[in-house]
């Protein structure tokens, strides 16, 4: 996962909110089956899209961030641009859906 940055409560602000490029954040958990299926899709997106920073947050390692952002189910993808939340998708999401989601939300 060299193209995916692991983020937790300590570095969320720096890695996501202060990023100069759009950031796709994959919220999941080790115990979540669909999250494990989402991971290789997110990794492929990260490899194919160098203009978007991709971060992975395990909600058990980042309970403050997960609570603050209202994460109720996983996997959840959230997109941030210029430090602001611009959209989310809940549930297992295909590579094409992720690409379209990011493109429509960031132009």
Summary of predicted features, one role per range:
Residues 23, 63, 69-78, 96:
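Structural micro-motif
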Residues 20, 28-31, 73:
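Short pre-active-site segment immediately N-terminal to redox-active cysteine/selenocysteine motifs
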Residues 32-35, 77:
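The canonical Cys-X-X-Cys-His
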Residues 81-107:
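Non-catalytic, surface beta->alpha helical segment in thiol-disulfide oxidoreductase systems
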């Amino acid at each position: 996962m060299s193209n995916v940055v692991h983020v937790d409560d300590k570095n969320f602000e720096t890695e996501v909110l202060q990023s100069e490029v759009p950031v796709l954040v994959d919220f999941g958990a080790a115990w979540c089956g669909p999250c494990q299926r989402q991971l290789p899709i997110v990794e492929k997106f990260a490899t194919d899209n160098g203009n978007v920073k991709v971060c992975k947050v395990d909600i058990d390692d980042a309970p403050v961030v997960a609570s603050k952002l209202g994460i109720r189910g996983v996997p959840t993808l959230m997109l941030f641009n210029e430090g602001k939340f611009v959209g989310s998708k809940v549930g297992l999401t295909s590579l094409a859906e992720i690409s379209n989601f990011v493109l429509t939300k960031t132009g």
